[in-house]
Each structure stands twice: as structure tokens, then as C-alpha cells.
Amino acid sequence: MRIDVVSIFPEYLAPLELSLIGKARQDGILDLNVHDLREFTTDKHRSVDDTPYGGGAGMVMKAEPWAQALSTVAAARAGDAARKPVLIVPSPAGERFTQALAHELAGEEQLVFACGRYEGIDERVIEWAEEHFTVRPMSLGDYVLNGGEVAVLAMTEAIVRLLPGVVGNPESLVEESHSDGLLEYPVYTKPSSWRDREVPPVLLSGNHGKIAQWRRHQQYRRTAQRRPDLLAEFDAGNLPRADRTALGDLGYDVVDGHLRHRPEEPGNGAPADG
């Protein structure tokens, strides 16, 4: 896979030289290139922004430096020349980046990240880029950062770690949070007793079937407590009886293949009507 990142702060991307991402670059699994947007300016001040039309606060990133930078990146496209690279524009106005999207993007030949700053990039750049790229504005969440670089670090790691050969034990990718729409189960290591807290006995039993079932039920419990919104989207159509029972104990019923949370009955923590 080839990844290109365009930013006015290329040094911000230095962490991509470390850990598994850095090793993937060394091993030839990942070809990652960081480009300084200011290298594509033509004035002596190397300016990349100007005041917004229509007034308002802040500055807007100018179109021409971006067009020059993206044209250069597009000319160096990887893989099938007929297949457009994917241009990801980190933005709080983009679609939510998820583990499912990370898996989808891990199958692409080339990704390009455009790190905006200030009030954003001139919208005409996005319109122009659609002729040369598959444009995907994306957001890490419902909050605002100073620029796209932090989001690029997170997205790149989430995507690259899914490439074959990057993570040493591929099974760890299968069992982690969000891989199946649920949060990961709790994990423990030695010693088995620590400050009067014990490791759950089932994990010491050696019974792999019971351990797998316990872990699955813990996934349901943790997801219900921390991210109940994920259970609302969870495909429950083919769950075994033990899973349905565990979810029932948490207040969830399977209805038409989806999970529905039962309202608490009066006397169980919910006030009675009237």
C-alpha cells in the first residue's frame, strides 16, 4: 500500500516512523510519503491561506497550492492506473471513521490524506479533486481539532495494522474491540492474585469452551455498559441460545434479528407512572 500525506506541518507525522507502522515501512509493506504543502506555493511568503469570501472568522486554505500538491501525488499513483486513489479529507463534517471503514480502506492500493488547517480548504479543491480521486471526507468524532494531522495519525495506524504482515499475531485482530461490532472483553495477566483482586476462575480452568463463552458474555456486558449504541446496530439474527440468555440478563431481547432493550419495570429502578 502507498500512503501520501499533505500537511503544512510534516514533522507532525514523525510518529509514523515508530513502532509497527515504522517497521511496516522498513519491511516494504507500506510506502508512506509526507509532503509539505508550502513546497507547492509560488509566492515568496509561501502562503497557503487567505481571508474567506463572505466574511467571517479565521482563514481558508488556498486552492492552488492544494491542486499542485494533489496533482503531484496523483501522478505518482500506485497500482492499477485506472483505479483512482482515495483522497481522505479529515473534517468534523465528514463521515464517521469506524473499524469497518478501516477494513475497507486497507484494501485500497493508494490513500492520500489532505490535512486541512484554519477554517478548512477552499471547497473548489474538493470539487476539482473528484475528477482525479475518490474523495472521502472523514471524521474521528463529533469534536473539532486544530488540524487534520492528529486524525491522520489515528486513521493511518487503524488502517495499516490491518495489512497482512504488520501485526505479528493475526488472531489479535479478530478478537479486539469493534472487530465484530462489540467491545473487547477484559484481559488479565500474572499474578493471579493482586492486591486482594483475583483473576476470574474460569480463565484459570483450562476449559477453552467455557473461556470463550465467558469472554463473549463479557463483551456483551461491557458493550451494554459503555456503548449501548453498538448493540442497537448489532446483527443478532443467528445468536446461539447461551448468547441470547446472556443478553436477556442484561435487559436485551432479540427481535427480528436486532437487539431491543427492555424498559425497566417499576420497582427495578424505574419510577412508576403517575
Swiss-Prot record:
Belongs to the RNA methyltransferase TrmD family. It comes from the Bacteria. NCBIfam families: PRK00026.1, trmD. The gene is trmD. It is found in: Cytoplasm. Pfam families: tRNA_m1G_MT. This is tRNA (guanine-N(1)-)-methyltransferase. It catalyses: guanosine(37) in tRNA + S-adenosyl-L-methionine = N(1)-methylguanosine(37) in tRNA + S-adenosyl-L-homocysteine + H(+). Keywords: Cytoplasm, Methyltransferase, S-adenosyl-L-methionine, Transferase, tRNA processing.
